[in-house]
Design a protein with these regions (language model features):
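Aromatic pocket-lining residues of Rossmann-like dinucleotide-binding sites
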Residues: 23
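Conserved acidic carboxylate
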Residues: 10
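Conserved acid/base catalytic micro-environments in cytosolic active-site loops
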Residues: 2-4, 14-20, 28, 39-40, ...
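Glycine-rich phosphate/oxyanion-binding loops and their immediately adjacent helices
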Residues: 36
């Protein structure tokens, strides 16, 4: 079996050694190289042609943001941003340049190590395309007539999103007007500690009111509610947000099925469900109910 070839990029020797040690426990993965800064990473990608790159953000010589931009413009490869919770906002800038996903730097505990390895295996199989300068042309947003909203106030859009989702959301949401006539609720698979950073990043590029869903929020037209990763999100019969505790057995966080199923129960045929990107089967049951 062909092994997954990984390039590890981090200015911290200790961090590189930890990531390499974790990856080396899986016989399907081979670390083919390491780099201590973005400039070296760009060169190593060109030389080694890895299947996937783990990329730190804050580094000397060339930071991770610029390295991602250069790599995706010349030798496109799946990139997983590996950073700290404090770097959440900066990390999402990396997504806009073409990185596929982000995770918190793994610890030595077995659960985090297994999750990290699973993410590497998943992302390494995704086909990526050249991402010139990490920029897109966003179409001009035209606000909808206010009279429209009175006709469809009972409708809702529910989005299930996984790997590659933040990048896709950064394309879709900016094209919606600030008076979008119904609420949008989103369950995005994401590591704990990064939801607030994603929300702040999306606020910069869209006219919509975007927030992390909170217990008791009344869902309203023109607003986007993104589920926190620490709990699952439901819409209750009063059309308010209810947050549900995660269970140890839960594989996905937050759960797309939980959100979509609750939306189907409350809104019935006035709900629009969207599977934006997928990982495993999460969302399949919920979208069937919608």
């Amino acid at each position: 079996m062909k092994k997954i070839r990984v390039l590890v990029v981090d200015d911290s020797t200790l961090a590189r050694e930890l990531i390499i040690a974790i990856l080396s426990t899986d016989n399907e993965i081979q670390v083919v190289g390491e780099a201590k800064d973005g400039k070296e990473a760009v060169e190593k990608v060109r030389e080694l042609r890895p299947d996937i790159v783990t990329m730190d953000i804050e580094m000397p010589v060339m930071d991770g943001i610029e390295a991602i931009e250069q790599i995706m413009a010349s030798n496109a490869v799946p990139i997983l941003v590996v950073t700290t919770r404090g770097d959440a906002h900066t990390a999402y800038a990396a997504i806009s340049k073409g990185a596929l996903d982000l995770v918190v730097k793994p610890d030595v505990n077995l659960t985090e190590a297994k999750e990290f390895i699973s993410r590497i295996k998943l992302l390494s199989g995704i086909k990526v395309i050249t991402h010139i300068s990490g920029k897109r042309k966003i179409q001009k947003v035209i606000d909808m007539p206010t009279s429209v909203s009175t006709e469809i106030g009972d409708k809702i859009v529910a989005i299930a999103s996984s790997t590659g989702g933040p990048d896709a959301l950064s394309v879709i949401l900016p094209q919606l007007p600030k008076n979008f006539p119904c609420p949008i609720v989103i369950a995005q698979h994401i590591s704990d500690g990064f939801v607030s950073g994603m929300v702040e990043w999306l606020k910069l590029i869209t006219k919509l009111n975007i927030k992390v869903a909170a217990e008791g929020d009344v869902v309203s037209a023109g607003s986007v509610y993104i589920s926190p990763s620490e709990r699952h999100t439901e819409i209750n019969i009063s059309k308010r947000i209810s947050l549900v505790d995660r269970q140890p057995k839960d594989v996905y966080r937050p759960s797309c099925d939980v959100l979509l199923s609750s939306v189907a129960s409350v809104y019935g045929n006035k709900a629009l469900g969207v599977i934006l990107t997928g990982m495993g089967s999460d969302g399949a049951l919920g979208i069937q109910r919608i």
